[in-house]
Amino acid sequence: MSISPPDDLVASVTFDDRGLVPAIAQQEGTGEVLMMAWMNAESLRATLETGWATYWSRSRGELWRKGETSGHLQRVRAVHADCDGDTLLLTVDQTGPACHTGTRTCFTGRELVMPPAAVDPEEAAR
């Protein structure tokens, strides 16, 4: 199996009208979802070339290598595109917490409780 050059891989991704694509970081080995961030073509290319997760900061308008200042780096082990090519899944080896709040994941402490279903899902599936 041959490995495609980064530019070919970047060209295969469907970016939105702002030139961005959502990227979900997942811990290698456990499958734990760590965070979601945005990538543009330049940050995806940097990620593919260096092996370190590099995102696009919408608030700062610049590339952002995850953990560059905190030391909480993400070593990228694999990048997968979904079936439409408009969402990326990065399998990473996370050093330290992934979230800027200091928690392991960005999905800690904000669980939205589902209301009781009006219809039993198993009943509706029949």
UniProtKB/Swiss-Prot annotation:
Keyword Magnesium part of the UniProt annotation: yes
Enzyme class: hydrolase
GO annotation, biological process: L-histidine biosynthetic process
A GO cellular component annotation in the UniProt record: cytoplasm
Pfam families cross-referenced by the UniProt entry: PRA-CH
EC code: 3.5.4.19
Described purpose of this protein according to its UniProt entry: Catalyzes the hydrolysis of the adenine ring of phosphoribosyl-AMP.
Oligomer status and interactors: Homodimer.
Protein name according to UniProt: Phosphoribosyl-AMP cyclohydrolase
